[in-house]
Amino acid sequence: MAYAEITPDGSVRHASFQGMRADKKASQVVLETLVDVGSALDPATGNEIAGAVGVKLSHPDKTMYPNTPITKAHLAAYYAAVANRMLPHIKDRPLSLVRDTDNDLQKTFFQKHALPGMPRTLKSGQLTKIKGTESRILWIEDLAGLIGGVQMNTLEFHVWGSDRHTPDLPERLVFDIDPDEGLDFEHVKQAAVDIRDILGAIGLQSWPLVSGGKGVHVVVPLLPEADWIAVKDFCRDFAELLAKTEPQRFIANMSKARRKGRIFLDYLRNGQGSTAICPWSTRARAGGTVAVPVTWEELDGMDRANCFDIFAAAAKAQGPDAWEGYFQAQQTLTDQMQAVVKR
C-alpha cells in the first residue's frame, strides 16, 4: 500500500493498493519505522503520494527553486509531511495562489479564481461579501488540494481570515511586522514581543509566525463573532496607536519612502478579501523557504525569519506543536478592547 499518513487512531489516509508481496509472510509485514522527515523528503515518495490522492504530477523532476535540489515531487512530499499541521489553517478558507510558471522566481503571479485545466482537487465557487457583491473563490479541502496546487507550480498559499461557510465573520487577525530593508532582526523580534504583550494586556493571546521572508506575523485566533469592519478598525487603530506612541520605531503607512529605519505594522491583511500567508506554506523566495509557526521562546533564539527551508520545516512539523492551544482559544474582540486602542 502507498499512503499519505496513518492517523492517531490507526486509520490509513489516501491509501492506494500497489500489489501483493509474494516475498514475505503476513506476519513479517509491519509498520514502517519513523525516520527524520526533514532529511528524507523523497521525490519518489512525493510522486507516489500525488498519484494516491488523484493528482498526476507533470514533470515531477522539474526544479522549482533555482540553485536548489527542490523539485515538484519534493514539494508534494513536503506538503504530505506537513498536511496535518497545515490543513486546519487552510481547509475551506478562500485563498490566493502565488504561481511561478517559469520556475525562476522572476515572474510570479497571484491567482484567486478558477482557470481552465486546474486540478479538480482545488475547489472553486462563489460567495457573497458583506457589501453584497459576489466573489469568485478558490479553496482546498485536503492534501489532494495542496498537491493540486503543487501541480500548478504554486509556491505560496495565502488565506482569508474567515471560513467560506461564514465569510462575514473572521476567525483570526494578523499583524504583519514588515521592517525597512537593513533593519536588524532583533528589532523585528522585539516588535513582535511588544505587540504580544500589549494584546495580552487587553485580553488577547497571540502566536508568532516567521514569514519565510524578513518579517514576523503575530496571529490572534478569534471566535467568529466580531465582523470584518470591527476587526479591521481594531487592527488599524492598534497600528496607528503604536505609530503615535513610538514614531521612531513604527509606522502605520505602507509608504516605503517613509519607512526608513522603522517597521511598518501592516494591518491591511484584516479586511474581507485580503489574505495573509498560510502557516506551513512555502514562499516564492530563493532557497525554498517556508512560513513556520514557532513558539515565543523559539523566536527569541532566531536570527532571521527565513531560517526554515522545506527540509527543516518538514522535520519541525513532526515535533511538538508550536501553536499548542491556538485552535482552542476562546477569545473575541470586545467593545472594550476596541475602545482601548481607539485614541
Describe the function of each predicted region.
Residues 98-100, 206-212, 253-257:
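Short beta-strand
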